[in-house]
């Protein structure tokens, strides 16, 4: 379906008083549609009353998930950014074939192969974080102006699990120990509310240089946790590190279920 057709369909469901939690990208940049990572920006659900007013609904609304690639790197960046604002970042993602709806049986060309381009992914990976980091102003979510993010997105011969290599610079550089402590101690709304799908520990850091690995860690905590490793200082940026998440669990279906649980816990399905 075309994007305008999907937008119209989702609005029809909402106007029929059916809450819509969507993985589709059609409404991601609609100003009064929240694009929520439950552990990062749960407060964005507060835009729903404004959206309901526009749609003329009492119970129906539209909420969307961000692109699956963001789930690998944005959580690790976002929780640091809450205390130490990030000035700029370079992100390269290495995305599994299941992100294209494929398996090695249906896409044999990907065996022993790599494709250095995924249509539309780089634009999503640069722009969508700014909405997640945005603020509610009146009846809309206004995107953040920073950090400046530049990305490259590659398709790699892995069945499941999106990986990211991240370089970040800060307005005021924290110590490595401060970053590690932020990752270790962070708990978001899903953990505080004990949502059924939420991982007990959202962010897991691995000290070993060869960790995390897709085959070993993508299913951590039911595929809902984010794995991080190799944090170290960089010669051009302040720090660099790698991240991993399960793209069809945390990044898609599982994340959508967790998001629905958050809306239910906050009374938006009543």
Feature map (PLM): residue ranges:
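Short, charged, low-complexity patches
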Residues: 122, 249-253
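C-terminal substrate-binding/catalytic lobe of Rossmann-fold NAD(P)-dependent oxidoreductases
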Residues: 88-93, 97-240
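N-terminal Rossmann-like NAD(P) cofactor-binding subdomain of oxidoreductases
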Residues: 1-110, 114-117, 146-148, 220, ...
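Glycine-rich phosphate/pyrophosphate-binding beta-alpha loops
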Residues: 154-158, 245-250
């Amino acid at each position: 379906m075309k994007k305008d057709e999907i937008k119209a369909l989702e609005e029809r469901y909402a106007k029929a008083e059916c809450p819509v939690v969507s993985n589709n990208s059609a409404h991601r940049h609609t100003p009064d549609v929240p694009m929520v990572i439950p552990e990062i920006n749960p407060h964005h659900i507060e835009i729903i009353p404004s959206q309901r007013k526009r749609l003329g609904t009492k119970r129906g609304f539209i909420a969307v998930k961000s692109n699956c690639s963001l789930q690998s790197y944005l959580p690790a960046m976002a929780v640091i950014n809450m205390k130490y604002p990030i000035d700029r970042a370079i992100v390269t993602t290495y995305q599994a074939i299941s992100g294209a709806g494929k398996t090695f049986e249906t896409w044999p060309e990907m065996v022993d192969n790599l494709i250095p381009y995924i249509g539309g992914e780089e634009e999503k990976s640069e722009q969508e974080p700014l909405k997640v980091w945005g603020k509610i102003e009146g009846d809309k979510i206004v995107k953040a102006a920073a950090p400046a993010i530049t990305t490259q997105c590659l398709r790699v011969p892995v069945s499941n699990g999106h990986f990211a290599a991240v370089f970040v610079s800060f307005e005021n550089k924290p110590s490595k120990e401060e970053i590690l402590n932020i990752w270790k101690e962070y708990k978001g709304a899903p953990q505080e509310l004990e949502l059924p799908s939420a991982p007990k520990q959202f962010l897991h850091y691995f000290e070993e240089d060869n960790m995390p690995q897709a085959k070993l860690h993508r299913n951590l905590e039911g595929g809902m946790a984010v794995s991080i490793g190799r944090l170290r200082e960089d010669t051009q940026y302040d720090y660099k590190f790698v991240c991993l998440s399960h793209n069809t669990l945390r990044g898609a279906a599982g994340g959508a279920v967790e998001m629905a649980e958050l809306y239910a816990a906050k009374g938006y399905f009543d």
